[in-house]
Curated annotation (Swiss-Prot):
It comes from Nocardia farcinica (strain IFM 10152). ATP binds at P122, T123, G124, C125, G126, K127, T128, Y129. Zn(2+) binds at C13, C16, C35, C38. Keywords: ATP-binding, Chaperone, Metal-binding, Nucleotide-binding, Zinc. NCBIfam families: clpX (TIGR00382), PRK05342.1 (NF003745). Residues 1-54 form the ClpX-type ZB domain. Belongs to the ClpX chaperone family. It holds the Pfam family ClpB_D2-small. This is ATP-dependent Clp protease ATP-binding subunit ClpX. Component of the ClpX-ClpP complex. Forms a hexameric ring that, in the presence of ATP, binds to fourteen ClpP subunits assembled into a disk-like structure with a central cavity, resembling the structure of eukaryotic proteasomes.
Length: 426
């Protein structure tokens, strides 16, 4: 591009018709000219179109039943949690489309407030995966933060604003898009108050963090350091409004079930105890009857609980669910390993009793679905080491003995190819 300097006023912008003297700059192309004012206008139009495309359109927003159906393809079990999340997410993005306000039947403006989500349940039962799958479906920025790394401002550790930086980074620094994203804060039970009564000494990683999270959970204009770390007065900040950011806060809350049973009167020991099998106890939704006062007794402050009105709970996965997780979802572990072996030209087969044995091992270890991959790696490591160096293996079969007794998987050799017969008449 050539830039036109001083000269006559015969040169005009090909778009608005203004002469060179009427504008600050006129830039020339092959037979055309464009002025600085038209360039600014083009930039504004492009920015508006990009902002519109990054928003979740209401007519495209899936209904709660569709959200739940999508989750079914990836997450096994946890039906109650799926329903709760589907409704909460649908209402949240419907509220964003309404611009935080809606009109009732009398034509009065009604302000629609945000409903963040609290997820309760044991480790390895799908809390994080549910949130990740939701974000994938809605095509919105998603960030995971660990509450245990957070401390109150002014102390060693991460500020709560660093959570927002992760979301901005997930949106490729598009702040407008980040403002409609989802933040998942894990291990929130670890920032519970150390005692039920407020302490005289400062609890910088417990109650202090809860206090620091209040504003961003509710919705505020936050100043985020672009490089992370601590704030200092001489640096520039990224401004982000958290009013439309959906927060999903989760934790295992070990010990909360005892607080609930003490309140409801369900005795676990003694002559009046309910007699239940171990399987029933393991798959019971311990948190179905949770009330705000139980969470306060556990160590969450009332203001923090008040900003998490939607409560979803997940249960321990039983053997049947773990077997389904191994083989049924779209990206099931068995399908992943079959694909890995296919890349080496080898078939991989798991017998049904092998899948059940892997599920039993995960239950014994108490790691839930998260432990399935570790068990699969242990079982398949010897053959995954040998097979790339061999060309005589057709199929690998994993049985229950492979899992339980540390026996090598059965290797089925490739049939030798017969040499082609030559025609004697040739």
């Amino acid at each position: 591009m050539a830039r036109i300097g001083d000269g006559g006023d015969l040169l005009k912008c090909s778009f608005c018709g203004k002469s060179q003297k009427q504008v600050k700059k006129l830039i020339a192309g092959p037979g055309v000219y464009i002025c600085d004012e038209c360039i600014d206008l083009c930039n504004e139009i492009i920015e508006e179109e990009l902002a519109e495309s990054s928003e979740v359109k209401l007519d495209e927003l899936p209904k709660p039943a569709e959200i739940r159906e999508f989750l079914e393809n990836y997450v096994i079990g946890q039906d109650a949690a799926k329903r709760t999340l589907a409704v909460a997410v649908y209402n949240h993005y419907k509220r964003i489309q309404a611009g935080d306000k809606g009109r009732d039947s009398r034509g009065e403006t009604v302000e629609l407030t945000k409903s963040n989500i609290l997820m309760l349940g044991p480790t390895g039962c799908g809390k994080t995966y549910l949130a990740q799958t939701l974000a994938k479906m809605l095509n919105v920025p998603f960030a995971i933060a660990d509450a245990t790394a957070l401390t109150e401002a002014g102390y060693v550790g991460e500020d709560v604003e660093n959570i927002l930086l992760k979301l901005i980074q997930a949106a490729d620094y598009d702040v407008k898009r980040a403002e409609t994203g989802i933040i998942y804060i894990d291990e929130v039970d670890k920032i519970a108050r150390k005692s039920e009564n407020p302490s005289i000494t400062r609890d910088v990683s417990g109650e202090g963090v809860q206090q620091a999270l209040l504003k961003i959970l509710e919705g505020t204009q936050a100043s985020v350091p672009p490089q992370g770390g601590r704030k200092h007065p001489h640096q520039e900040f990224i401004q982000i409004d958290t009013t439309n950011v959906l927060f999903i806060v989760a934790g295992a809350f070990a010990g909360l079930e005892k607080i609930i049973s003490d309140r409801t009167g369900h005795r676990g020991i003694g002559f009046g105890a309910e007699v239940r099998s171990k399987a029933e106890i393991d798959t019971t939704d311990h948190f179905a009857d949770v009330m705000p006062e139980d969470l306060i007794k556990f160590g969450l402050i009332p203001e923090f609980i008040g900003r998490l009105p939607v409560v979803a709970s997940v249960t321990n996965l039983d053997k049947e669910s773990l077997v389904k997780i191994l083989s049924e979802p779209k990206n099931a572990l068995v399908k992943q390993y079959i694909r890995l072996f296919e890349m080496d030209g080898v078939e991989l087969e798991f017998t049904q009793d092998a899948l059940e044995a892997i599920a039993d091992q995960a239950i014994l270890r108490g790691t839930g679905a998260r432990g399935l991959r570790a068990i699969m790696e242990e079982v398949l490591l010897p053959v995954m080491y040998d097979i790339p160096s061999r060309d005589d293996v057709a199929r690998v079969v994993v049985t229950a003995d492979t899992v339980n007794d540390n026996v090598l998987p059965t290797i089925v050799p490739r049939k030798p190819q017969r040499p082609e017969r030559r025609d004697k008449s040739a």
